[in-house]
Amino acid sequence: MIGMNRLIFSKAFTSSCKSVGKVPFAKSITRANTRYFKPTSILQQIRFNSKSSTAPNTEANSNGSTNSQSDTKKPRPKLTSEIFKLLRLAKPESKLIFFALICLVTTSATSMALPLMIGKIIDTTKKDDDDDKDNDNDDKDDTQPSDKLIFGLPQPQFYSALGVLFIVSASTNFGRIYLLRSVGERLVARLRSRLFSKILAQDAYFFDLGPSKTGMKTGDLISRIASDTQIISKSLSMNISDGIRAIISGCVGLSMMCYVSWKLSLCMSLIFPPLITMSWFYGRKIKALSKLIQENIGDMTKVTEEKLNGVKVIQTFSQQQSVVHSYNQEIKNIFNSSMREAKLAGFFYSTNGFIGNVTMIGLLIMGTKLIGAGELTVGDLSSFMMYAVYTGTSVFGLGNFYTELMKGIGAAERVFELVEYQPRISNHLGKKVDELNGDIEFKGIDFTYPSRPESGIFKDLNLHIKQGENVCLVGPSGSGKSTVSQLLLRFYDPEKGTIQIGDDVITDLNLNHYRSKLGYVQQEPLLFSGTIKENILFGKEDATDEEINNALNLSYASNFVRHLPDGLDTKIGASNSTQLSGGQKQRVSLARTLIRDPKILILDEATSALDSVSEEIVMSNLIQLNKNRGVTLISIAHRLSTIKNSDRIIVFNQDGQIVEDGKFNELHNDPNSQFNKLLKSHSLE
């Protein structure tokens, strides 16, 4: 619909052109380029517990099974393919978009017909005034205007039809806006769900290296899920509508301008080449700047998430000022990038506005001369100027459409980077086995963490653990004890060698099904916000109350849970007032694992925060599980109280080699054993 400014302009122009004298100066009002403020959110990230640290500018030292992680730079895709790739994201909403476009065409048709109608109304009114002056008839019949026909209709019928047309236009405009907003919200919801699901399906290589080769951090992933998807949604919903509307308005407006006056149209068309060229260069620059801004926002979110998670450490070391300084640096990076965009946008829109104003003045001057020559009527010039405003606005709108499209492509590149990244380890392929029966064997294992290719962990490692055995892995920090659990859980695949359970190589098994048979408790367990019961049911959703109580008893968590005001319904998590101690968290985490009834239980310093009494009770319960149910127990420990409860001790040296293997008493009684050397060096407590 035409805004009030255009109606005011047409009235002022009509009154001034009756005498074909002085022409008032008309200011063109350009639309402000508003930025879209993106919402932020905090998502809980599930990260695999890897002992590796992410180092920049490193690459995976893998078995070469994946070509997608090649270090060779991919060729830059063509702009056309990038646009079609972006548009394909909206394919599921194609029906809604189709109906929205029908509403858009209807609204645009009504709007584009209005200038011609206004011109005819002006000419009809002017003709009446001229007739009155010629006839000097002051007692004009009141019914005379009704006899004047506008587009073949009497004036009452014409204005009634015009009112109906306005109602239809308003209704279709409502439908357009509602449908496109619906498309945008559906699109962003689907993208966020798809991205989150894709991230959870990734392996540890993704977090250690990822598409960037420097590792994927939680803050950057949050930015891509929350911010980039919003930009894409805007680019594919309202922006597409604005672009199509600009095309329709521009084409129809140009056609009607040619119909009214081809001479004025020729003058108007001279501004199109420079405007289109400027828009093209501006869009290319904006695309790069938009991607840079989104990357800066990702870096800031990453720093925010990291520092807020460690606020107690920051306060302990009194480093608030230095942390704020580093955070301000991230804000400064975003500010500088945004100011570059602001300067570019200011130059682009101010130049376009200047060209538009000069063009309008030129058209008015030339139009008044054509009226004086009798080639145009006042109504024709009014219609032409309104169509000129429409066409000029459409050209500017196309520039803004192209700009927003480039922003969408910049954000889509970061989203596609995650969507198209293929994990090295599939979660769904492979066979499913009902039971994990047999011994665990590591045969000729070579392994290096992908983020530390220069530091090998294992070289030709051979390890045999019998089914139902209670084994403890000991050694100095960094000797590869936790890496054994990482490989057994298949967070990583070895570069060489195989890992078998019975006759099954674990790489041949369905990963999700395989992990459902394992139990893994970390030294620093992650408990989700919610109740204690909800956290335990995370291990087994359909667990009965009897199974929950049994798991609580085995982990000795029932000892403190029953003293809580709300028992199992007690809210826990960082956002709640009820906080658990380290030992209590470990016991809840152990209960969450034991409720799955795993056949292989891996404890990575799982009782390190427990007091001696609680640890003794928990270890006694786990030993009973080992003896009565045949659960294979693999402990990784530095505490002597945990080590001595194991049937077999496997000692690693700093190079990741097994140097001793035997019972606790045998190794402890040998004064020259590596085990005793670890005790003397206080590597074991």
UniProtKB/Swiss-Prot annotation:
Please give the Pfam families that the UniProt record associates with this protein.
Answer: ABC_membrane, ABC_tran
Tell me where on the tree of life, at the top rank, the source sits: Eukaryota
Intracellular or extracellular location(s): Membrane
Q: Residues in domain ABC transmembrane type-1? A: 97-407
Membrane topology, as annotated: Multi-pass membrane protein
Q: Which positions in this protein are listed as binding ATP? A: G475, P476, S477, G478, S479, G480, K481, S482
Q: Which UniProt keywords apply?
A: ATP-binding, Glycoprotein, Membrane, Nucleotide-binding, Transmembrane, Transmembrane helix, Transport
The molecular function GO annotations come to: ABC-type oligopeptide transporter activity; ATP binding; ATP hydrolysis activity
Comp. bias regions, Polar residues: 48-70
What Gene Ontology cellular-component terms does the record carry? mitochondrial inner membrane
Q: Quote the PANTHER family the UniProt record gives.
A: ATP-BINDING CASSETTE SUB-FAMILY B MEMBER 10, MITOCHONDRIAL, ATP-DEPENDENT PERMEASE MDL1, MITOCHONDRIAL
Q: Which family does it belong to?
A: Belongs to the ABC transporter superfamily. ABCB family. Mitochondrial peptide exporter (TC 3.A.1.212) subfamily.
Cystine links in this protein are none
Q: What is this protein called?
A: ATP-dependent permease MDL1
Sugar attachment sites are N63, N239, N336, N553, N576
Ranges of residues in domain ABC transporter: 440-680
InterPro entries recorded for this chain?
AAA+_ATPase, ABC1_TM_dom, ABC1_TM_sf, ABC_transporter-like_ATP-bd, ABC_transporter-like_CS, P-loop_NTPase, Type_1_exporter
Q: According to the UniProt record, where is the region Disordered?
A: 48-76, 125-147
Q: What is the first-listed, main subcellular location in coarse terms?
A: membrane
Output the PROSITE patterns linked to this UniProt entry: ABC_TM1F (PS50929), ABC_TRANSPORTER_1 (PS00211), ABC_TRANSPORTER_2 (PS50893)
Give the matching CDD domains: ABC_6TM_ABCB10_like (cd18573)
